[in-house]
């Protein structure tokens, strides 16, 4: 499995819109996607972390390079102060 962790700072007052966008994105049938988790930080309610897990690095890269994902990214950016900080890598342990 392979995926990304994104650190995001949401614009003031846009927290609900951001979550709606994230939920809409979650409902799209993205090939190879295994799981999506969104965390809202206790220390700062405008700071979110999103983890996205794919079956493989190839599935992740295919999604990242797709025009559909680019459109979802642009929609998400309407609620964010700046671009997310991305951390990509292999899943080396999971227990669900």
Predicted regions and their residues:
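Conserved short-loop catalytic and cofactor-binding motifs
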Residues: 6, 48, 61
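Short, surface-exposed ligand-recognition loops at beta-strand->loop->(often short) alpha-helix junctions
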Residues: 9-20
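Short coil/turn motifs at secondary-structure junctions
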Residues: 11-13, 41-43, 55-57, 94
């Amino acid at each position: 499995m392979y995926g990304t962790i994104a650190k995001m700072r949401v614009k003031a007052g846009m927290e609900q819109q951001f979550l709606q966008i994230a939920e809409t994105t979650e409902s799209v049938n993205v090939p190879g996607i295994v799981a999506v988790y969104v965390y809202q930080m206790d220390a700062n309610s405008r700071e979110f972390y999103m983890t996205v897990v794919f079956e493989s690095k190839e599935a992740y890269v295919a999604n990242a390079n797709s025009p559909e994902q680019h459109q979802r990214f642009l929609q998400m950016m309407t609620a964010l102060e700046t671009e997310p900080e991305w951390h990509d890598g292999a899943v080396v342990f999971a227990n669900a």
